[in-house]
């Protein structure tokens, strides 16, 4: 399953991040493979807002389609 399929309120575990530049950027933001995050919002246009601890990160729909997850 990919992150773009997560519904608001779902807690998910990140299985695989896109490689290269995107992966490095997520790691800088404190998000890595194996982390548990909350899908806190789904915005118009497909943007997904995830929350880890008290930090929220908005992820565009194209990038969300490249992030593999599993529901908890």
Regions picked out by a protein language model, each given a short descriptive name:
Residues 1-72:
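Compact, glycine-rich, soluble single-domain proteins
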